[in-house]
Amino acid sequence: VEEKEFKGDVFFMGQDFGFNHANVILLLGFYENEIYILKELYVKGLETNEIINLAEDIFEKNVIMWCDSAEPDRIKAWQKAGFRAVGVSKEKNSITAQIDYLMGKKIIINPSCKNTIREIENWCWMKDKNSGEYIDIPTPINDDAMAALRYGIEYVRKI
């Protein structure tokens, strides 16, 4: 976590949809081998239209927003509101590939992104049930910002 001025010009957003779990939107900046987490919206228990209203005060609509493709109706609502929301295609082993990509980057988090900081500090790995060894799959608990981060880097990861 550090306060560091972002000097790049490549931006994407990542969104993990939620209601009981957090709905998270992250604004990401990309520069050389660094990923900047610049802004977050982290809310629970809100309808999509309520989240859109909050997001309109925080994020630019012209930045592509990579979203969980499992929720096409929500993506459509964001598009109708003027956001450039697009579903991320989920491929076999994509979570592992996204995490490998992230591990090769320096991630700089704006101190205002308190929920993202909390999640990344508490991120842990699953254990194999038989051997007890850690495996390369994160524990799916309190990982909403991490999912938004993974969605937000997916396009850049593939180029």
List each model region and its residues.
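ATPase catalytic-site recognition across NTP-hydrolyzing enzymes
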Residues: V1-Q15
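Short acidic, Gly/Ser-rich segments with clustered Asp/Glu that frequently serve as metal-coordination loops
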Residues: M13-N23
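Generic detector of well-ordered alpha-helical packing
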Residues: F17, S69, D144-A145
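Short hydrophobic/aromatic beta-strand or adjacent loop that forms the aromatic wall/cage
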Residues: A22-I25, R150
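Residue-level detector of short, conserved catalytic/binding motifs and their immediate flanks
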Residues: N23, V63, M146
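Mg2+-dependent endonuclease catalytic cores in nucleic-acid-processing enzymes, primarily RNase H-like
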Residues: L26, Y31-P140
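Charged alpha-helix within mobile-element recombinases
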Residues: D136-G152
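Acidic two-metal-ion nuclease catalytic site recognized across multiple nuclease folds
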Residues: E154-I159
